[in-house]
UniProtKB/Swiss-Prot annotation:
GO terms for molecular function: DNA binding. GO terms for cellular component: nucleus. This is Endothelial differentiation-related factor 1 homolog. Residues 81-135 form the HTH cro/C1-type domain. It comes from Gallus gallus (Chicken). It is found in: Nucleus.
Amino acid sequence: MAESDWDTVTVLRKKGPSAAQAKSKQAVLAAQRRGEDVETSKKWAAGQNKQHFITKNTAKLDRETEELHHDRVPLEVGKVIQQGRQSKGMTQKDLATKINEKPQVIADYESGRAIPNNQVMGKIERAIGLKLRGKDIGKPLETGPKGK
């Protein structure tokens, strides 16, 4: 009992592995062998410049039993985008540059493969001057003064 006094502190544990070592494949396998809980998660869209995320609730899709897919842009809207773009003499690349999107986004919207995003739809509407949402699809866009 002589060595346990109030001024000394005894630490009985080792320093854990650093973050880089803990992420290695070797460390993960060793932890699994010891029976410890190991959580792995995959990085999504790492290294890419993803501006627009899919805003639909994915948990809602998980609970859904029948149709497990998002609504796509109707072909009618794709045709309106294509006609409006061609009437202004723009290529898909020109339109994409004008609205600060990638040409692939425009191609997806025109072919009906894209999941509708109101922000992108609004930019395309203003660029080609035609309505793409609501009941008057294909009608000219009314540009009035903004009121507060």
